[in-house]
Amino acid sequence: MSLPVEAVIDFLKSEQARGKTHVYLDDDAREGLRELFIRARQQVAKPEEISQETANHSASASAPTPEIPAVVELKIEGADKAAKLESIRQQADNWQPAKALDSLRENMVFATGSPDAKLMLIGDAPGHNEEKEAEPFVGPAGQKLNDILKAMGVSREEVYISNLVKFRPSMPRQTTNNRKPSPEEMAACLPLVMAEISIVQPTLIIALGGTVAEGLLGLDGKISEMREKWHDLSGIPVRVTYHPSYLLQSGGSNQVKRSLWEDMLAAMEKLDLPISEKQKSFFLPKS
């Protein structure tokens, strides 16, 4: 049985007050935090309801679940999509639920692209290049993503590209090396990307990598078991596929390229984009 998540949070707060930034958590404690993370994902499915939740918070007579500051504090303001996204960007810049973890770096990296995009692509977290340029997917993996979009017949400016975590995860003696975000880091930043989704209202979302699938959809397992199907996020279809960096790590494997491309073909079909015979045959074995 999992430990009461309130006890885990109290322990983490006490350790933080003592100046500790890293602690060991056993499986029960981790499971408690995972349950909290899943509840947070469910609670922020519709960011426009956040203000109402805040108003009702003090009037609730039932025993509340552990309070998630990100859910309570986030406000969406503005007359149009661009203005609303700007309001989220400003709040993200000093997002206390993320900064309080003391495990993320200081520079915030927000999204890029069109507020009216039909296609939204979400990565896990910014890396060294993204932190330096303050824009998601600008390094080698970003170039791969640009190539994929070009092959689809769309430009980077037509889509909306974001990351689940808005700050680069930190490491001891860190230079250009990166690490994937933890469940706690994803939970802290989840309200931000959920607000972006609510504002942009894309026709579909591409989740780039297993970490995003875990943080955004609560999935766990191998990418091969998650892809080739549509998942649902607040009524928006989501396709899970390989992160562009995996193309680099796989040594240019045509099998990996074809698998990713098949997910993109499925997205193109759902978006009613034209698909040529040449596009259909990309990365197929030559007869």
Placement of each model-derived feature along the sequence:
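A polyanion-binding, active-site-adjacent surface
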Residues: 21, 37-287
